[in-house]
């Protein structure tokens, strides 16, 4: 896949991130099945197993007692979130050296729009991917997998085809053979619940999901996301750049070293998240009129609450109070594994000023 006027979107994902970093911190467990887990939670859940543990059937979100049944010699290591964050920061610093259009989607993965950067690498996207892989490996001792395509959905799916430390490229000619035969559970973003609902109406493979005769019943399950998803899977959507996506939302989240259920402790962590997203909002000269908060529990279930503001703003106090009020409504004294905030429906500050000027 080489640059020929078409977008080049790369998805970069650090392989078994938490487990690999913990393995680096504990070299005595090299070549042992290990997993990062929350031993102090009520449930005891696996957060991230290394690849050796996965070969025994150990998976993320699996109860620790069940993981131990599958792999009796499994070593459970505590979460070291501050250290993970340090490694993550170094990873994104490396990525930004190669491309300035980067969309960070979590602590260990991102998308880059390499459409314009690829010229520096002889229009060879595989060469660019390998250079990033090798620098991350040499400097951080982490392996990353790279998926490359012309939209984010297909690029993310490509990453999963050749893990760990793989490079997968999917162009229009390969979609039918590599993507359409896959199970619908392989589609990013739809989740296990939606997958089960699609199974219940006899839609099992991607080719069945995108078939025109299944449109009506699939739309009932997937709602407004159906058409965009199908267009992505068919390769029909005009690709928006990473710069375009910056104007959709700004978000930040934190996974706790131990599950928390103290309101004030969680609230203090929330304060830092709010400060982070508002500072980024101001840095990009943007404003928002929609905020959301998401909470992930030890069993990996997630609760999301959203609120529309009466007007566009970048005012810290306004956003702070809105998010804190939202948190008070959604939090019910449960143990919390992760908390995140998001500013949505973003617009350039200048455009809001122009609209106000029209009514002066």
From Swiss-Prot:
Site features described as Substrate discrimination, chain residue numbers: 18
Top-level EC class as recorded in UniProt: transferase
An example Gene Ontology CC term for this record: cytosol
One Pfam family hit: IMS
PROSITE patterns the UniProt entry points to: UMUC
Subcellular location: Cytoplasm
InterPro entries from the UniProt entry: DNA/RNA_pol_sf (IPR043502), DNA_pol_Y-fam_lit_finger_sf (IPR036775), DNA_pol_Y-fam_little_finger (IPR017961), DNA_polymerase-Y (IPR050116), DNApol_IV (IPR022880), Rev_trsase/Diguanyl_cyclase (IPR043128), UmuC (IPR001126)
Cofactor: Mg(2+)
Top-level division of the source organism's lineage: Bacteria
Location (main, coarse): cytoplasm
Active site positions: 109
Domain UmuC: start-end pairs: 9-191
Signal peptide: none
Cofactor, how bound (note): Binds 2 magnesium ions per subunit.
Keyword Nucleotidyltransferase among record annotations: yes
Keywords: Cytoplasm, DNA damage, DNA repair, DNA replication, DNA-binding, DNA-directed DNA polymerase, Magnesium, Metal-binding, Mutator protein, Nucleotidyltransferase, Transferase
Amino acids binding Mg(2+): 13, 108
Record's keyword annotation contains Oxidoreductase: no
EC numbers: 2.7.7.7
Gene Ontology terms for molecular function: damaged DNA binding; DNA-directed DNA polymerase activity; magnesium ion binding
GO biological process, one term: SOS response
Catalytic reactions on record: DNA(n) + a 2'-deoxyribonucleoside 5'-triphosphate = DNA(n+1) + diphosphate
Protein family per UniProt: Belongs to the DNA polymerase type-Y family.
Protein function: Poorly processive, error-prone DNA polymerase involved in untargeted mutagenesis. Copies undamaged DNA at stalled replication forks, which arise in vivo from mismatched or misaligned primer ends. These misaligned primers can be extended by PolIV. Exhibits no 3'-5' exonuclease (proofreading) activity. May be involved in translesional synthesis, in conjunction with the beta clamp from PolIII.
Subunit structure: Monomer.
The name this protein goes by in its record: DNA polymerase IV
Provenance organism: Ureaplasma urealyticum serovar 10 (strain ATCC 33699 / Western)
Gene: dinB
């Amino acid at each position: 896949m080489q640059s020929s006027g078409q977008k080049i979107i790369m998805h970069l994902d650090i392989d078994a991130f938490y487990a690999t970093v913990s393995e680096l911190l504990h070299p005595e467990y090299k070549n042992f099945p290990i997993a990062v887990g929350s031993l102090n939670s009520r449930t005891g859940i696996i957060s991230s197993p290394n690849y050796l543990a996965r070969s025994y059937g150990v998976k993320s979100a699996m109860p620790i007692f069940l993981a131990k049944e599958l792999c009796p010699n499994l070593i459970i290591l505590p979460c070291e979130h501050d250290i993970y964050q340090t490694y993550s920061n170094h990873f994104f610093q490396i990525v930004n050296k190669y491309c300035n259009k980067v969309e960070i989607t979590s602590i260990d993965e991102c998308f880059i729009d390499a459409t314009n950067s690829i010229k520096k690498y002889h229009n060879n996207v595989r060469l660019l991917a390998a250079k990033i892989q090798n620098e991350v490996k040499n400097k951080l001792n982490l392996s990353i997998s790279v998926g490359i395509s012309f939209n984010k959905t297909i690029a993310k799916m490509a990453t999963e085809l050749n893990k760990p430390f793989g490079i997968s490229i999917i162009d229009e000619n390969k979609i039918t053979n590599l993507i359409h035969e896959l199970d619908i559970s392989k589609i990013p973003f739809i989740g296990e619940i939606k997958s089960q609902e699609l199974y219940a109406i006899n839609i099992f493979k991607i080719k069945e999901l995108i078939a025109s005769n299944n449109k009506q019943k699939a739309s009932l399950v997937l709602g407004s996301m159906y058409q965009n998803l199908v267009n992505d899977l068919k390769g029909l959507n005009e690709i928006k750049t990473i710069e375009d996506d910056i104007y959709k939302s700004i978000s930040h989240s934190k996974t706790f070293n131990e599950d928390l259920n103290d309101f004030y402790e969680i609230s203090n962590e929330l304060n830092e998240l709010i400060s982070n997203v508002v500072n980024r909002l101001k840095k990009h000269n943007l404003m928002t009129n929609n905020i959301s908060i998401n909470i992930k529990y030890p069993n990996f279930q997630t609760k999301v609450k959203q609120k529309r503001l009466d007007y566009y703003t970048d005012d810290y106090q306004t956003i702070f109070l809105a998010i804190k009020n939202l948190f008070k409504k959604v939090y019910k004294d449960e143990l919390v594994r992760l908390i995140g905030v998001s500013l949505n429906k973003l617009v350039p500050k200048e455009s809001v000023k122009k609209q106000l000027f029209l009514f002066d």
